[in-house]
Amino acid sequence: LKMFDWKKPTVQMLGRWQPWHKGHQELFKRCIDKTGQVIIQVRDVEGASGGKGQDDNPFSWETVCKNIESNLKKDGYNRGVDYEIMLVPNITNITYGRGVGYVFEEEIFDEDISSISATKIRASLREKGKL
């Protein structure tokens, strides 16, 4: 039985996930291809500001987890096996020294993915009375 291995090299995805959407799903797929498992870190921003231009955070930790789990399940990924989700403080800065043993990588996507906007998704949910 394969389980999430806390000692194994792992890709970190840090974000607000307000809400998790197709762009995040595609990023996850690239991440899991690198090491076989991913830790999704959810910044604790419900009802708070995540920084400049990041004040709109209506989804709770519980809702964010449900959104992530249900979407990843559609593509066959299981929490506790392929990934784990962790609540973390409202991280706004990441600093490091030299030779730390990890890298920062930006993934570039085509316009159909890069144009997805959580801001627009939240606005649409509000228009439909779902948020």
For the regions a protein language model found, what residue spans apply to each?
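Nucleotidyltransferase catalytic core that binds NTPs
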Residues: 1-131
